[in-house]
């Protein structure tokens, strides 16, 4: 065998070896004291024929029994928000310490509510342009809902081919907010495309499902929460006939009533109506954590620890709304829920009851439209003998739950959300 041929064979082996171990184990994170008490892997999966799209992920093994525990793929909303927010704010094993930024790396602390105590979780930055995900070349096609479903499915297939020990684990897809448009069709795509994946179901928090319906339900929600008067609500019902989004241009009375309504709620924090509508750069603001995460993710030592490719992106932003051109080509995901129900997949749909962006009334409405019988009627679910929310189960293996006092995402009530998840994923009653 010639030296040239031997060299080429060696090169091929090295390339294949590199691709087979594209993830990197992270044992230390800037801001966290000592070695991480869990196993974290970060890396990229190339998507497309030339792998021009590089999707970044964080993978955390279950702290209980990773060989047998469920595998969960977690998607954040937006579209365009990094899954790092889910990891550090909602359901991960570490969180940013809430303290005033002093110029150094923001501190990380261990959490007690991590979903990784009972599941392996892949936190995926998607679509391309979110978090640390990027494209090596300009995209030919505009990013879209249906396009992302296919990209994420390709990601999952390639990720599992490099982590084959997780093929047999019960598999779930989860997310919140805008991922309500992506997760149901993704479940359908996985179900029809790859029977090797042990797909069991999906989990959605405050899911955007039908934007027009959700906006219309904000008005009865506002009335129920004493944000508008009985008189205004009844007038809006009568004159606008329940349609507050696509109003007839000749219905001037309805337009006036909507203006009166907007005066009542324009300074409201719709993501959690009990919290102030405040500047996130102020340490007094609950969402000051969004300022801290921006400092943390843009720190050079953090990027090095996470093995982020140098020069791949500029400034990390929590939600990259400005730079992602997006085609919202799925107008409603209700039909996908119906198909997933027919196919027998389990689902947990939960709502923070103080979220006005996706009011629980809207979620209940589309669940009713599936027309499945109730198997376990409306009742409180409890933690330490206290009401944590309310729940109802249906014959299509769907469980609906509210989280009392929570807002648009799990970060508002992480402990309660974690307990709810633990019970559901273990097939126990909430």
UniProtKB/Swiss-Prot annotation:
Disulfide bonds join 81-319, 240-254, 278-285. The active site is at residues 177, 355, 408. One of its GO terms (cellular component) is extracellular region. It holds the Pfam family Peptidase_S10. This is Serine carboxypeptidase-like 13. Gene3D superfamilies: alpha/beta hydrolase. Glycans are attached at residues 102, 299, 323, 371. Residues 1-22 form the signal peptide. Catalyzes the formation of 1,2-bis-O-sinapoyl beta-D-glucoside. It comes from the Eukaryota. Its EC number is 2.3.1.103. SUPFAM superfamilies: alpha/beta-Hydrolases (SSF53474). GO terms for molecular function: serine-type carboxypeptidase activity; sinapoylglucose-sinapoylglucose O-sinapoyltransferase activity. It is found in: Secreted. Keywords: Acyltransferase, Disulfide bond, Glycoprotein, Secreted, Signal, Transferase. Expression not detected. The lineage of its organism: Eukaryota, Viridiplantae, Streptophyta, Embryophyta, Tracheophyta. It catalyses: 2 1-O-(trans-sinapoyl)-beta-D-glucose = 1,2-di-O-sinapoyl beta-D-glucose + D-glucose.
